[in-house]
Amino acid sequence: MTRTSPTLVLASTSRYRRELLARLRLPFEVLAPNVDETPLPGETRSATALRLSVLKAQAAAMTHRDALVIGSDQVLMLGTEQLGKPGDHERAFAQLKKMQGRAMVFHTALTLLNSRTGSVQTRDVPTVVHIRPLTDAQIEAYLKKEQPYDCAGSAKSEALGIALMERMESPDPTALIGLPLMALTEMLAQEGVDVLTWPAT
Protein backbone atom coordinates (compact mmCIF):
# COMPACT_ATOMS: atom_id res chain seq x y z
CA MET A 1 0.00 0.00 0.00
CA THR A 2 1.54 3.29 -1.08
CA ARG A 3 0.84 6.69 0.33
CA THR A 4 -1.41 7.47 -2.66
CA SER A 5 -3.48 4.30 -2.18
CA PRO A 6 -7.09 4.36 -0.94
CA THR A 7 -7.58 4.96 2.74
CA LEU A 8 -8.48 2.42 5.36
CA VAL A 9 -11.97 0.95 5.32
CA LEU A 10 -13.79 0.35 8.59
CA ALA A 11 -16.37 -2.39 8.11
CA SER A 12 -18.66 -1.33 10.93
CA THR A 13 -21.72 0.79 11.64
CA SER A 14 -20.67 1.36 15.26
CA ARG A 15 -20.12 5.01 16.14
CA TYR A 16 -17.88 3.88 19.00
CA ARG A 17 -15.52 2.12 16.58
CA ARG A 18 -15.54 5.15 14.28
CA GLU A 19 -14.61 7.41 17.17
CA LEU A 20 -11.83 5.06 18.25
CA LEU A 21 -10.32 4.72 14.77
CA ALA A 22 -10.38 8.51 14.38
CA ARG A 23 -7.91 8.71 17.28
CA LEU A 24 -5.20 7.37 14.97
CA ARG A 25 -5.67 10.40 12.69
CA LEU A 26 -5.65 8.32 9.53
CA PRO A 27 -8.10 8.89 6.67
CA PHE A 28 -10.68 6.11 6.48
CA GLU A 29 -13.99 5.21 4.93
CA VAL A 30 -16.89 3.51 6.68
CA LEU A 31 -18.87 0.68 5.15
CA ALA A 32 -21.80 -1.23 6.63
CA PRO A 33 -21.10 -4.97 6.25
CA ASN A 34 -24.00 -7.29 5.53
CA VAL A 35 -23.20 -10.63 7.18
CA ASP A 36 -25.15 -13.43 8.84
CA GLU A 37 -24.21 -13.26 12.53
CA THR A 38 -25.77 -16.61 13.48
CA PRO A 39 -23.29 -18.76 15.48
CA LEU A 40 -22.31 -22.08 13.93
CA PRO A 41 -23.23 -25.31 15.75
CA GLY A 42 -20.68 -26.06 18.47
CA GLU A 43 -18.87 -22.76 17.95
CA THR A 44 -17.56 -20.95 21.02
CA ARG A 45 -18.63 -17.34 21.44
CA SER A 46 -15.08 -16.04 21.04
CA ALA A 47 -14.69 -18.11 17.86
CA THR A 48 -17.94 -16.63 16.57
CA ALA A 49 -16.66 -13.11 17.18
CA LEU A 50 -13.40 -13.86 15.36
CA ARG A 51 -15.19 -15.44 12.40
CA LEU A 52 -17.61 -12.52 12.13
CA SER A 53 -14.79 -9.98 12.20
CA VAL A 54 -13.27 -11.78 9.20
CA LEU A 55 -16.61 -11.98 7.38
CA LYS A 56 -17.23 -8.26 7.90
CA ALA A 57 -13.82 -7.40 6.47
CA GLN A 58 -14.37 -9.75 3.52
CA ALA A 59 -17.78 -8.22 2.80
CA ALA A 60 -16.31 -4.72 2.67
CA ALA A 61 -13.37 -5.90 0.57
CA MET A 62 -15.76 -6.95 -2.19
CA THR A 63 -16.20 -3.30 -3.15
CA HIS A 64 -12.70 -2.11 -2.20
CA ARG A 65 -10.09 -4.00 -4.20
CA ASP A 66 -7.02 -2.07 -3.03
CA ALA A 67 -7.55 -1.24 0.60
CA LEU A 68 -6.81 -2.27 4.14
CA VAL A 69 -10.13 -3.34 5.61
CA ILE A 70 -10.82 -3.46 9.34
CA GLY A 71 -13.42 -5.84 10.72
CA SER A 72 -14.30 -6.20 14.39
CA ASP A 73 -16.82 -8.00 16.56
CA GLN A 74 -17.32 -8.34 20.29
CA VAL A 75 -19.03 -10.75 22.65
CA LEU A 76 -19.56 -10.40 26.38
CA MET A 77 -19.57 -13.49 28.57
CA LEU A 78 -20.76 -13.69 32.18
CA GLY A 79 -19.70 -17.20 33.08
CA THR A 80 -21.17 -19.34 30.31
CA GLU A 81 -23.93 -16.83 29.47
CA GLN A 82 -23.59 -14.35 26.64
CA LEU A 83 -24.92 -10.87 27.35
CA GLY A 84 -26.05 -8.61 24.53
CA LYS A 85 -27.29 -5.05 24.21
CA PRO A 86 -30.21 -4.57 26.61
CA GLY A 87 -32.27 -2.27 24.41
CA ASP A 88 -34.35 -0.85 27.26
CA HIS A 89 -34.27 0.15 30.94
CA GLU A 90 -35.78 -3.04 32.33
CA ARG A 91 -33.30 -5.35 30.61
CA ALA A 92 -30.38 -3.06 31.47
CA PHE A 93 -31.34 -3.13 35.14
CA ALA A 94 -31.55 -6.94 35.04
CA GLN A 95 -28.12 -7.16 33.42
CA LEU A 96 -26.42 -4.92 35.96
CA LYS A 97 -28.19 -6.66 38.83
CA LYS A 98 -26.81 -9.97 37.58
CA MET A 99 -23.33 -8.59 36.91
CA GLN A 100 -22.78 -6.67 40.16
CA GLY A 101 -20.04 -8.15 42.33
CA ARG A 102 -18.89 -10.47 39.54
CA ALA A 103 -16.30 -10.65 36.76
CA MET A 104 -17.18 -10.76 33.08
CA VAL A 105 -15.09 -11.21 29.94
CA PHE A 106 -15.29 -9.18 26.74
CA HIS A 107 -13.80 -10.93 23.70
CA THR A 108 -12.99 -8.30 21.08
CA ALA A 109 -12.08 -9.83 17.73
CA LEU A 110 -10.09 -7.81 15.21
CA THR A 111 -9.30 -8.50 11.55
CA LEU A 112 -7.16 -6.52 9.12
CA LEU A 113 -7.54 -7.67 5.52
CA ASN A 114 -5.42 -6.43 2.62
CA SER A 115 -7.85 -6.71 -0.28
CA ARG A 116 -5.06 -6.32 -2.85
CA THR A 117 -2.81 -9.13 -1.58
CA GLY A 118 -5.40 -11.22 0.24
CA SER A 119 -3.39 -11.28 3.47
CA VAL A 120 -5.45 -11.54 6.66
CA GLN A 121 -4.41 -10.80 10.24
CA THR A 122 -6.67 -11.66 13.16
CA ARG A 123 -6.54 -11.14 16.91
CA ASP A 124 -8.78 -11.94 19.90
CA VAL A 125 -8.21 -9.37 22.64
CA PRO A 126 -9.85 -10.37 25.95
CA THR A 127 -10.79 -7.90 28.67
CA VAL A 128 -11.80 -9.05 32.15
CA VAL A 129 -13.99 -6.52 33.95
CA HIS A 130 -14.84 -6.80 37.64
CA ILE A 131 -18.08 -5.01 38.54
CA ARG A 132 -18.43 -3.46 42.00
CA PRO A 133 -21.14 -4.62 44.38
CA LEU A 134 -24.06 -2.30 43.57
CA THR A 135 -27.33 -1.44 45.27
CA ASP A 136 -30.58 -1.23 43.33
CA ALA A 137 -30.58 2.53 43.93
CA GLN A 138 -27.11 2.87 42.41
CA ILE A 139 -28.11 0.86 39.36
CA GLU A 140 -31.25 2.94 38.85
CA ALA A 141 -29.34 6.21 39.26
CA TYR A 142 -26.70 5.13 36.75
CA LEU A 143 -29.23 4.03 34.14
CA LYS A 144 -31.20 7.27 34.42
CA LYS A 145 -28.05 9.34 33.95
CA GLU A 146 -26.43 7.37 31.11
CA GLN A 147 -29.12 5.23 29.43
CA PRO A 148 -26.54 2.75 28.05
CA TYR A 149 -29.13 0.65 26.27
CA ASP A 150 -27.03 0.23 23.11
CA CYS A 151 -24.05 -1.24 24.99
CA ALA A 152 -23.52 -4.91 25.78
CA GLY A 153 -23.42 -5.21 29.55
CA SER A 154 -25.28 -1.91 30.03
CA ALA A 155 -22.15 0.05 30.98
CA LYS A 156 -20.14 2.66 29.09
CA SER A 157 -16.57 2.44 30.32
CA GLU A 158 -15.65 5.61 28.42
CA ALA A 159 -18.21 7.57 30.45
CA LEU A 160 -19.94 7.25 33.85
CA GLY A 161 -19.97 3.47 33.52
CA ILE A 162 -16.36 3.42 34.68
CA ALA A 163 -17.72 4.07 38.20
CA LEU A 164 -19.42 0.66 38.11
CA MET A 165 -16.10 -1.08 37.64
CA GLU A 166 -13.75 -2.25 40.37
CA ARG A 167 -10.89 -3.15 38.06
CA MET A 168 -10.14 -4.47 34.60
CA GLU A 169 -7.44 -6.61 33.06
CA SER A 170 -6.59 -6.25 29.37
CA PRO A 171 -3.54 -5.97 27.12
CA ASP A 172 -5.35 -3.20 25.21
CA PRO A 173 -7.74 -0.87 27.07
CA THR A 174 -9.47 0.32 23.88
CA ALA A 175 -10.61 -3.25 23.21
CA LEU A 176 -13.37 -2.83 25.78
CA ILE A 177 -14.97 -0.04 23.73
CA GLY A 178 -14.90 -2.18 20.59
CA LEU A 179 -11.69 -1.62 18.59
CA PRO A 180 -8.26 -2.61 20.00
CA LEU A 181 -6.09 0.26 18.76
CA MET A 182 -2.80 -1.11 20.10
CA ALA A 183 -3.33 -4.39 18.26
CA LEU A 184 -4.51 -2.54 15.15
CA THR A 185 -1.40 -0.35 15.18
CA GLU A 186 0.75 -3.50 15.14
CA MET A 187 -1.28 -5.00 12.30
CA LEU A 188 -1.04 -1.82 10.23
CA ALA A 189 2.73 -1.79 10.73
CA GLN A 190 2.84 -5.30 9.24
CA GLU A 191 1.20 -3.80 6.15
CA GLY A 192 3.71 -0.97 5.94
CA VAL A 193 1.56 1.68 7.60
CA ASP A 194 3.38 3.46 10.45
CA VAL A 195 0.61 5.27 12.29
CA LEU A 196 3.03 7.83 13.73
CA THR A 197 4.55 8.91 10.39
CA TRP A 198 1.60 8.37 8.06
CA PRO A 199 0.06 11.63 6.75
CA ALA A 200 -2.60 12.72 9.23
CA THR A 201 -6.16 13.70 8.39
From Swiss-Prot:
It is found in: Cytoplasm. GO terms for molecular function: nucleoside triphosphate diphosphatase activity. The active site is at D73. The keyword Hydrolase applies. SUPFAM superfamilies: ITPase-like (SSF52972). Its EC number is 3.6.1.-. The record marks Y16, Q74, E158 as: Important for substrate specificity. Keywords: Cytoplasm, Hydrolase, Nucleotide metabolism. Its cofactor is a divalent metal cation. It comes from the Bacteria. One of its GO terms (biological process) is nucleotide metabolic process. GO terms for cellular component: cytoplasm. InterPro entries: ITPase-like_fam, Maf-like. It catalyses: N(7)-methyl-GTP + H2O = N(7)-methyl-GMP + diphosphate + H(+). Nucleoside triphosphate pyrophosphatase that hydrolyzes 7-methyl-GTP (m(7)GTP). May have a dual role in cell division arrest and in preventing the incorporation of modified nucleotides into cellular nucleic acids. PANTHER family: BIFUNCTIONAL DTTP/UTP PYROPHOSPHATASE/METHYLTRANSFERASE PROTEIN-RELATED (PTHR43213), BIFUNCTIONAL DTTP_UTP PYROPHOSPHATASE_METHYLTRANSFERASE PROTEIN-RELATED (PTHR43213:SF5). Belongs to the Maf family. YceF subfamily. This is 7-methyl-GTP pyrophosphatase. It comes from Thiobacillus denitrificans (strain ATCC 25259 / T1).
